[in-house]
Amino acid sequence: MSRITAIPAWKLRKIMEKAGFKCVRTEGDHFVYVKPGVARPVVIPDWDEVPVFIIKNNLRTAGISRDEYFELLSKV
């Protein structure tokens, strides 16, 4: 199984958009994404490198599995 590593914020935003999320607003240097059927918004900081723990928390919030994440990452 592949290991999740830190990635640039723009890549994580593209992954969320490919998963059906829409950016509804920005708050400071954070982008807020929502999707119908997902209870909580996904918040992505606009940093050069997003740490692994934030990526994992956002994947859990979005309901995206590791396999889906790597599939979407390969398309970005």
Residue ranges of predicted features:
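N-terminal first-folded block
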Residues: 1-27
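Short, flexible active-site loop motifs that bind/organize anionic cofactors or intermediates
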Residues: 2, 45, 59
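Glycine-rich, flexible loop/turn motifs
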Residues: 3, 40, 69
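Glutamate identity and glutamate-enriched acidic tracts
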Residues: 17, 27, 49, 68-71
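A short, structured beta-strand/loop element
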Residues: 22-56
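C-terminal structural segments of small proteins and small subunits
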Residues: 51-76
